[in-house]
Regions:
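Active-site acidic/histidine clusters and adjacent loop/turn architecture
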Residues: 36-115
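Second-shell loop/turn segments in exported
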Residues: 25-31, 82-91, 129-130, 156-165
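Sequence contexts marking disulfide-bonded cysteines in secreted/extracellular proteins
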Residues: 13, 39-41, 62-64, 85-87, ...
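Catalytic cores and adjacent binding grooves of peptidoglycan-active enzymes
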Residues: 15-18, 60, 66-68, 132-210
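C-terminal motif of bacterial Sec signal peptides marking the signal peptidase cleavage site
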Residues: 8-11
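Post-signal peptide N-terminal segment of mature Sec-exported envelope proteins
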Residues: 20-46
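Active-site-adjacent substructure of cysteine-protease-like catalytic cores
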Residues: 106-138
Length: 210
């Protein structure tokens, strides 16, 4: 595992303006939370994923990046990844490896060479709400497109209701795979705010897949 670096988390490019806040001292974790984070980091390292442990940060307004990592190599390149909670990073890595990659091969007949995202951390409320988004806790990631070795780029905006049956099937399969790993998964079927991306997060009570 690489030595930790102090990095400012990347913001998400959709669903609200990005707020720049100076990092402060994060609240102290309980012994249980510290043990959960330690175990998560050990499990993530055991999968062969390369990552950097980030320092805990509080950005004010309820926004924070606690128990977070920056993924370096999960087996397929991913754009725009900033701070992610360890649990989110673990689930995302597994989804990319065991969900998206084989789905591209089996359904589209191509090798997945890149996953494009709109980012992870972004201190903002949920679109149309005053409630803080899970992005504000580094606990969400938005997927925008998939790039294949043959040059095809499958993006959510144009692919979700594509005339190509295989493209539609692929995107719904990767959503279904995500629903097995994340507490909340939102797609263009949820609302217009998600017309161009798949939102995955580990917040709330879980069990919401749309």
């Amino acid at each position: 595992m690489a030595l930790p670096l102090i990095l400012v988390p990347a913001g998400c490019s959709t669903g609200g303006s990005k707020q720049v806040r100076r990092p402060g001292i994060a609240p102290r974790l309980s012994a249980v939370q510290e043990e959960q984070t330690r175990q998560c980091l050990a499990n993530l390292a055991g999968t062969g994923v390369m990552f950097e442990r980030l320092p805990d940060r509080s950005y004010g307004g309820g926004c924070s990046a606690i128990g977070a990592v920056k993924l370096i190599d999960i087996g397929v390149p991913v754009s725009n990844l900033g701070a992610m909670t360890c649990g989110l990073a673990s689930n995302f890595s597994a989804w990319a490896r065991y969900g998206a990659t084989p789905a591209a091969r089996q359904i589209l007949g191509g090798e997945l060479i890149k996953i494009e995202t709109f980012g992870t951390y972004n201190c903002r409320p949920i679109a149309g709400s005053a409630r803080l988004s899970e992005h504000g806790r580094a606990n969400a990631v938005d997927i925008s497109a998939f790039l294949l070795a043959d040059g095809r780029r499958i993006d959510i905006r144009n692919g979700w209701n594509s005339s190509d049956e295989k493209v539609r099937e692929f995107l719904r399969i990767v959503r279904a795979s995500a629903c097995k790993r994340f507490r909340t998964v939102l797609s263009p079927d949820y609302n217009a705010a998600h017309h161009d991306h798949l939102h995955f997060d580990n917040g709330g009570r879980g069990g919401y897949c749309r």
